[in-house]
Amino acid sequence: KAFYEYHSILMEPWDGPAALLFSDGRYAGGMLDRNGLRPARYTITKNDMMVVASEVGVMDFDPTEIAEKGRLQPGKILLIDTQEGKIYYDGEIKERLAEAHPYRKWLNTNRIELEKLRSGRKVENAVENLTRKELEFGFGAEDIDGTIIPMATKGQEPTASMGNDTPLAVLSDQPQIFFNYFRQQFAQVTNPAIDSIRENLVMSLTEYIGRVGSGILNPDESNCKMVRLPHPILTNTQLDILQNIRYKGFNTVKLHMIFETAKGEEGLHEALDELCKQAAQSVDDGYNYIILSDRGVDETHAAIPSLLAVSAVHHYLIDAGKRV
């Protein structure tokens, strides 16, 4: 379990659906995605031949020649060492990998679990001038009554999310929030359907934020220097804790993503450029957690859309070689 927790910091879950066959010249093997949504069957003969394919019968063998046959289970792996002439099964492979390093010790020593932290600081949740804020950030009555209130009060999926036949924002002559200009270009489906609650064995909302250490190819405890979030939505208290973490190696800075409305489009460009430069300078100053905040919105300042601000800072730091 610690092995998987460690590697979940460094890579996304492999959902597939896919069956993967691989070889480096010495080792050859097959692996199935963790949901098992693709068939993968194997046959091992008595004369030391192994066939892995999506269907049985890709190669014809006399039944008396077959030593073993079966199918790869979800997330399982089958490996051949051609030098040793040995077959390694899933349990043996993963046991070796899990025991190669003290993953549990690394996690316990370095990882911070945000949901377990407590703060004596009082955090104010009230919002002044709520109606004005709703207008500034593009929230309408339909968003509030049909989406936010049902989700917040009943914890249920809003029916408002089941379809959207409104005109494209780019063709509208009405003011639109920045997010409305982006649409997924294809319909993403799973077959069979996956439910995040009933399928919680293979699904998670857990997120990690922080600086990657030595990387996935060099297992090291520096990769565990992360904050684990139980889900991507933070309360005001959790955000306050995050920006006031005082553990060794965790340094946080808050940058404002706002611009002067009087300067119009030019002011937005200037503020965005300045925000990117501040982020790069913060990295040089030793900060490894950057919080972008639009809490400074008032009569003379508007928010830089979060999608625009985050993507701009992200790519600016990558181009500068500071995003790790």
Predicted regions and their residues:
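Amphipathic alpha-helical
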Residues: K1-Y4
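Extended, highly charged accessory segments
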Residues: S8-M11, M31-D33, K86-E260, E265-L275, ...
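Conserved catalytic micro-motifs used in adenylation/nucleotidyl-transfer and phosphoryl/amide-
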Residues: E12-V51
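Conserved structural-core and active-site-/substrate-pathway-adjacent residues in large, well-folded domains
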Residues: G36, I77-L78, D294, V313
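Acidic, glycine-rich flexible loop/linker segments
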Residues: K46-H101
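Short, ordered loop/turn segments at secondary-structure junctions
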Residues: Q83, R295-V297
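Secondary-structure transition/capping motifs at alpha-helix termini
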Residues: A280-I290, H315-V324
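Short glycine/threonine-rich loop-to-helix capping motif typified by GTGT followed
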Residues: E299-V310
